[in-house]
Amino acid sequence: MKTVTIITIIVVIIVVILIIMVLSKSCVSHFRNVGSLNSRDVNLKDDFSYANIDDPYNKPFVLNNLINPTKCQEIMQFANGKLFDSQVLSGTDKNIRNSQQMWISKNNPMVKPIFENICRQFNVPFDNAEDLQVVRYLPNQYYNEHHDSCCDSSKQCSEFIERGGQRILTVLIYLNNEFSDGHTYFPNLNQKFKPKTGDALVFYPLANNSNKCHPYSLHAGMPVTSGEKWIANLWFRERKFS
């Protein structure tokens, strides 16, 4: 009788352990999924193309209250008067993107704590971050569908990659809400986002453990119909950004 009881207990323990293992794999959070971002360039082929749509991918999500409204105002005031026409990889093309932008050094005391916060939460090195890009959209301005990283073997892409590899993490902060429309739209997911002031939209340009752009990461800044839309982009590369 004692032997049967001991066997039953052992079986129950094994079943419980197996259940815990299954749940731990299926319930991995967004933050744990990016825990290895700082080493995801290991053993990857330099095949900068497109992943299949059914390849593994962590979908976009909103990170609430990343910065407070006072900090948002401070960034907008600092950027105002320093803006120039936004650019894409191939230069300035207003048929693709017709906003205004400027850059703030990631070492600027005004924004450095934001970067450090993201680095802690997502386990990415500070050195892998680009500078902060601040963007303003006026009425009827937009950014057509695009990927945040490189998806072909063009000269522009090669030069882009040389500066630290692919972009592997995008943190897009909405600095204000005083505008109409202007959502961030992911056509292949049929999802659009318009976070509140100080919230960040987080997404990954690449398929999991890959150098390839995932179709789900294709996105657009929809046209603003009234007011001014202000955002700030934090991008992190595979390696140290230069």
Curated annotation (Swiss-Prot):
Key words of the record: Dioxygenase, Iron, Metal-binding, Oxidoreductase, Virion, Vitamin C
One Gene Ontology MF term: iron ion binding
Obligatory cofactor(s): Fe cation; L-ascorbate
GO cellular component: virion component
Known EC number: 1.14.11.2
Major location category of this protein: virion
InterPro entries linked to this entry: Oxoglu/Fe-dep_dioxygenase_dom, P4HA-like, Pro_4_hyd_alph, Pro_4_hyd_alph_FE2OG_OXY
Catalytic activity from the UniProt record: L-prolyl-[collagen] + 2-oxoglutarate + O2 = trans-4-hydroxy-L-prolyl-[collagen] + succinate + CO2
Location in or out of the cell: Virion
Enzyme class name: oxidoreductase
Domain (Fe2OG dioxygenase): residue spans on this chain: 128-238
Highest taxon of source: Viruses
Function: May catalyze the post-translational formation of 4-hydroxyproline in -Xaa-Pro-Gly- sequences in the 6 collagen-like proteins of Mimivirus.
Family membership noted in the UniProt record: Belongs to the P4HA family.
Name recorded for this polypeptide: Putative prolyl 4-hydroxylase
